Amino acid sequence: MEEQVANAIEIASNPSADPALKTQAFEFVNQLRSDPSGWQVCLSLFTQTPQRSGIVRHVALEVVNSAAQGGLIDLQALAYVKDGLLAYLRQVYGQDAGASDPPNIQNKIAQTITFLFSALYASGWESFFDDLLSLTHKSPSSTTRDNASGIIFYLRVINSIHDEIGDVLVSRSRNEQDKANALKDLIRQRDMQKITSSWQQILSEWRDGNDVIVEMCLKAVGSWVSWIDIGLVVNQTMLDLLFQQLGRAQKEDLRQGEEKVRDAAVDVFTEIIGKKMKPEDKIDMIIFLNLDTIVSQLSNSPPLHGNRFTFKYDTDLAETVAKLVNITVIDIVRALEQEGVSAECKEKANGLLQAFLPHILRYFSDEYDEVCSTVIPCVSDLLTYLRRIAKVNPALASQHSSILLPILKAIIAKMRYDETSSWGEEDEQTDEAEFQELRKRLGILQQMIASVNEQLYMEAVSEMVATTFENLRQSGSQMDWRDLDLALHEMFLFGDLAVKAGSLYTKSNPNNQAAERLIEMMLRMVESDIRSFTHPATQLQYMEICVRYSSFFHHHTHLIPGVLENFLQLVHHPIKKVKTRSWYLFQRLVKQLRQYVGNVAQTVVEALGDLLVIRAELPSEVSEGDEMSSEDHDLADAIFNSQLYLFEAVGIICSTPTVSPDKQVLYAQAVLNPIFLDMEKNLEAAKSQDERAILQIHHDIMALGTLARGFSDWMPGTNTPATLPAPEVSAAFNQVAEATLVALESLKSSFNVRTAARFAFSRLIGVLGSRILPQLPRWIDGLLTQTSSRDEMALFLRLLDQVIFGFKGEIYSILDTLLTPFLQRVFSGIADPTTGTDDEIQLAELKREYLNFLLAVLNNDLGAVIISERNQPIFETVISTIEHFSKDIDDFTTAKMAFSVLSKMSSSWGGPDVIAEASNGAPLAQAPLPGFGQFMITRFSPLCWALPSTPSFNSKDAQAKQVLAEAGGLQRTIYAKTGMEYLTYLRDRELPGMGMGAELIEEFVGALSRLDLKGFRQFFPVCLSNFHHSLDLNMNN
């Protein structure tokens, strides 16, 4: 059997083995894992002499592990495994050992031994640590820990035990944590003294002999210290040993691996300080350990001081020391801010804070971002503490300037690009993203400083920015771009303090002192020569700042032409990342300064002409050599989406009130006519399904719609603009609608063309106003085709709601004409079968938009169109779909909306109220629809009981309750319109027919006639529950 298993493992792991044979071997080994006796064979395979191959032994031990952890080995058998492995350990790692196992096998044995410890240490293997410690001697009579392989294995297990029971980062169940705690208690009670003594012996005897042993031992001390008696580690003997290892930091040249020992020694101190203690004890511990001196010595050591700013600088040690500084300062601050801490302790903590401030600044300002990031948590805690003090006593804020100012200066310095950074290069993207993330974190710290001492923050930043612009004035393009970028970045952040409600001003006056400072900075920046902004990063910052603080230009209008000229240069930037971002920023700027830019409309249209040429590119056409700075800009459609901002910007500038209507038309046509010609040129190819031609027409239509958006502020969902564009302008855009419709009618099978046309339609509404209404049938015919998805239908329904809302006084006749064919397409979309979750989501959305459409018609006094002579044939289908939705147990949202529509129909067509309090707070109802009262009673009323009668209906569900409340509202509306006729019908026919008892019927009818709308909506769910309860009782009887 052993040979069979060994062969199977060899075959399964052999890359050149026959695939069929290999599959069989895999299956055999996997079956072995679940075989209750498989572990016995594998234990023998692992321990036998001569040793099997490494892969056989590794897999065999893995099977034993799996069986033990999977519960296939009982306690008695575990003792057998323990004995077998212990004998093996004594043979391989003990006094007569030869070569020990490779690291992967050692790790696997340590894992198994750790599991056996968890299972048997409490009962069955009480001598666990004695047995392992025996491996550390070369002979039983030896008094020194002199067996290197045994010591390494012992320490490997020690560290593995901590991972199993002591590591707080490991997630454990409540039972697992209880077991871990019990094992820790047992160790502390039985063996902790001898374990810590063993560490002292190992560190003493091997301090210069074997770096691997010393590093492993230090890691053990550092990990275990969090849950053992601190006195076992913090004693003179152990501290002397630790200080010896720290001494390695003073060496100029370390042998390979020695730096790991040094860093592990520092980590021990970090773990000691990280141990949970009372604030008083922690402060005393920091003082006792003399951590200030330790950190000073480490900071002044050759790797961190002598080699700083050279390629030999030891960043690993810097980060390790920074961790120690971080945890120490966090504890110092905690002692300062916690209530109940003695005055004496706080005084000591204050002294320590002053002592550690240079250490904080040293590592916070480290040129390596990883080191700086390590101390950000303690800086954040410190600033949070100072902010809390300043809130309680603002007078103290100035006293802390000695702490705040150096930290602020360090923050500002760290926000600067370092000398080695290469902005925008493809292979630097990860570094750039990490630096921007660091800037965000630093920005938060800077805000905290501003909240503690605003004046100090304003003065420091103002001085830095002013100095930078003065240097720029003197040195011009010779200035280091990193300095200018830093000043601009600080200006951008400064707005968090200066801007209120999106502006620097309140009633023409600066918001506050910060706004005054920022206005001064803006003047310096805008009056600088843009040619001095030689770097793309500073050019982008310039534009971002102009856009963010556009309110500045409302009060300095004389500067606008110069800024626009600068932007028009930058929108032609050779680097695509800058160019495409500048297109968006240009649109933002002119939108915010619309009232001041009309006088340069012609200049802008001419300057942007070359950028308004549309060239659609299929993915395969994008040139591989086309240099772009980020993934977003590698895609041609992303560039086109940015290009659209230019079309909107042109529309904004050309449509300002200072541009006469005839000039508006002239400028618009200068942009429109090339697009019309392009559409005409590509239409025939597009009809022949040429993909590039279709995409070109999609782009053309999107550009037309975006230009229209620039010409009108109107957005779907809002009322029509107070003043539409001049008739001449609307006439020009009527050509846009016509060109779009011609393309749509020819290419309506294309999803892309339909998408673009729907976008254009939504934007043309604001420019054409009611002129668009006669075209509605053509839009519907093109946008709702046989191939249109439910999503497209839902989106168009939403647009139509907005058209109805905007033009309710003018749309009736057109709506009357198009309603039947339009709704028939919607009904077809609803009826189509669904395949998969996405389809079901789209169907639910379409149902809701259909109901929303009906509500829009009814709410805008257009309900007559649904019951007009022309649309009479589909009335029954409209009602039946709503009835069907009201009974949908799987979609409460739609069911609730269905009842809302029925209530609105009832209040609209049911005639005047015969009972006070009409539902929905509706205005005067339309003329009653003959026979509709009886129709409501016989068709609508029973629906209120249909959904809750479904077996799976849960009346306690929150959404279900909302549906019932809406159904109750419908019943109250029917009663308001029909009065006693409805009560009689309920009493004599509907309720008895459902099996409702006479007493409950009278209660229901009485409540309906007595309660108002709100009261009955609350009553109906309760009544329904009582009714179902009575039915259950009758069935049981």
UniProtKB/Swiss-Prot annotation:
Primary location: nucleus
What are the record's GO terms for cellular component?
cytoplasm; nuclear matrix; nuclear pore
GO MF assignments: small GTPase binding; tRNA binding
Q: What exactly does this protein do?
A: tRNA nucleus export receptor which facilitates tRNA translocation across the nuclear pore complex. Involved in pre-tRNA splicing, probably by affecting the interaction of pre-tRNA with splicing endonuclease.
Q: Which InterPro entries match?
A: ARM-like, ARM-type_fold, Exportin-1/Importin-b-like, Exportin-T_C, XPOT
Short name of any one Pfam family annotated for the protein: Xpo1
**Family that this chain belongs to:** Belongs to the exportin family.
The organism that produces this protein has a lineage beginning with:
Eukaryota, Fungi, Dikarya, Ascomycota, Pezizomycotina
- Look up and give the organism this protein is from: Neosartorya fischeri (strain ATCC 1020 / DSM 3700 / CBS 544.65 / FGSC A1164 / JCM 1740 / NRRL 181 / WB 181) (Aspergillus fischerianus)
How is this protein named in the record? Exportin-T
Q: Which GO terms describe its biological process?
A: tRNA processing; tRNA re-export from nucleus
Sorted alphabetically, which keywords does the UniProt record give? Cytoplasm, Nucleus, RNA-binding, Transport, tRNA processing, tRNA-binding
Which cell locations does it reside in? Nucleus; Cytoplasm
Q: Which domain of life is it from?
A: Eukaryota
